[in-house]
Each structure stands twice: as C-alpha cells, then as structure tokens.
Amino acid sequence: LLKNLATVSLSCSSPTKGRWRGLGIQHCGYCLPCLIRRAALTTAWGAGGDATTYTVNDLHAQPLDTRESTGKQIRSFQYAIARLRARPQLANLLIHKPGSLADELTHLNELADVYRRGLAEVERLIDGVEARPS
C-alpha cells in the first residue's frame, strides 16, 4: 500500500520549481524533504525502487553547483555527515536544535539514534555526489 501511495504523495518544499522549465508540480529531488524522502525510499525498497519523478533525477550525473539550490542542501548534508562522523556524540546534542525534548527525557538515546540512522541513509544516497561552486 505504501509503495503505491508514495508516487502520489508530495514531500518537496517547492514543488513548482520546474514551472520555469515547462514542468508541472513534481519533486525537485534536491531540497531537504526530497533528499530525506529519496534516502528513506531507497533504504526501504532498494536502488531503483522509488518510482517518484524528480526534476533532478540523477544526483550523480554532473557536479551540483553549491551557489544554486541544486547543490546547497547536498553540500550541507555532506558537512553534517562529516561532522557527525568525526564526533558521533554530537547527535545527542543536535537532536535538541528543533526544540525542547523535556517531555522525552527517557527516549533521548533512541532519538539520537534515529538522527544518526537518518543521516546514514542520506549519506548512502549522496555518496559520490559532487557538490561545489561552479
């Protein structure tokens, strides 16, 4: 059921970005929600299992410009992944950035683990993607 519904669901932060290229509403493929979606669906269903149409379908096809929206979020994830790899204990602190977790004190380690696993999913998705100013 989820696999069938995933193609008609919308995660993109700006699904009308493609209108300037004559495209309809669709996932851009490179914003934060699209990257998390792609990483999660690839983890769940394997490479090629995500039937979603993305404006930028292949993140590896060419270097992504970090001065443009296509490369900014990729580079941000690359920095975050490298930072967490160097200091894994940071996850326990970073989970508090969105807001208070005072009502979840007994679950902080589990929440930090969700954060780590989520970044690991994105890391697998963007492994080998080149993001730099062009």
Give residue ranges: language-model regions:
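Nucleotide-activated chemistry modules centered on ATP-dependent adenylation/adenylyltransferase
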Residues: L1-S134
